[in-house]
């Protein structure tokens, strides 16, 4: 995913935290903030030290999240800035569980623009 698709600055992160709405499941929390006049969505990913004590574990989970979001890119609403925050429960997730849990929370947060992903899971 290109840098233009990322929420990069601390200021942008804080704006989404403070003004956005949150939705969560056991593995992830998603904060969303609608942004009009935006060509494409922007996402920020946060995996703290409570999730994985080593950088290897945290980076692995971030890779899984980015891969899932890249796969879902056509279905993600373009008018959003959103943050994906991993919870400690997600520590031992493999790619399949990461994808399943992330799709679930993105649906709850209404980040996905259609329901085509439902058929993919089954």
Swiss-Prot record:
One of its GO terms (biological process) is tRNA 5'-leader removal. It catalyses: Endonucleolytic cleavage of RNA, removing 5'-extranucleotides from tRNA precursor. Pfam families: Ribonuclease_P. Its EC number is 3.1.26.5. Keywords: Endonuclease, Hydrolase, Nuclease, RNA-binding, tRNA processing. GO terms for molecular function: 3'-tRNA processing endoribonuclease activity; ribonuclease P activity; tRNA binding. The keyword RNA-binding applies. One of its GO terms (cellular component) is ribonuclease P complex. It comes from the Bacteria. RNaseP catalyzes the removal of the 5'-leader sequence from pre-tRNA to produce the mature 5'-terminus. It can also cleave other RNA substrates such as 4.5S RNA. The protein component plays an auxiliary but essential role in vivo by binding to the 5'-leader sequence and broadening the substrate specificity of the ribozyme. HAMAP family: RNase_P. Consists of a catalytic RNA component (M1 or rnpB) and a protein subunit. Belongs to the RnpA family. This is Ribonuclease P protein component. It comes from Lactobacillus gasseri (strain ATCC 33323 / DSM 20243 / BCRC 14619 / CIP 102991 / JCM 1131 / KCTC 3163 / NCIMB 11718 / NCTC 13722 / AM63). The gene is rnpA.
């Amino acid at each position: 995913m290109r840098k233009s698709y990322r929420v990069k600055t601390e200021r942008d992160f804080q704006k989404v935290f403070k003004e956005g709405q949150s939705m969560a499941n056991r593995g992830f929390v998603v904060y969303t903030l609608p942004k009009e006049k935006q060509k494409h969505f922007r996402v920020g990913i946060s995996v703290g030290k409570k999730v994985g004590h080593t950088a290897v574990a945290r980076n692995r989970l971030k890779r899984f999240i980015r891969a899932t979001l890249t796969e879902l890119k056509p279905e993600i609403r373009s008018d959003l800035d959103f943050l994906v925050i991993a919870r400690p429960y997600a520590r031992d997730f493999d790619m399949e569980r990461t994808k399943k849990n992330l799709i679930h929370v993105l649906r709850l947060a209404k980040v996905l623009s259609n329901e085509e992903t439902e058929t993919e899971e089954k």
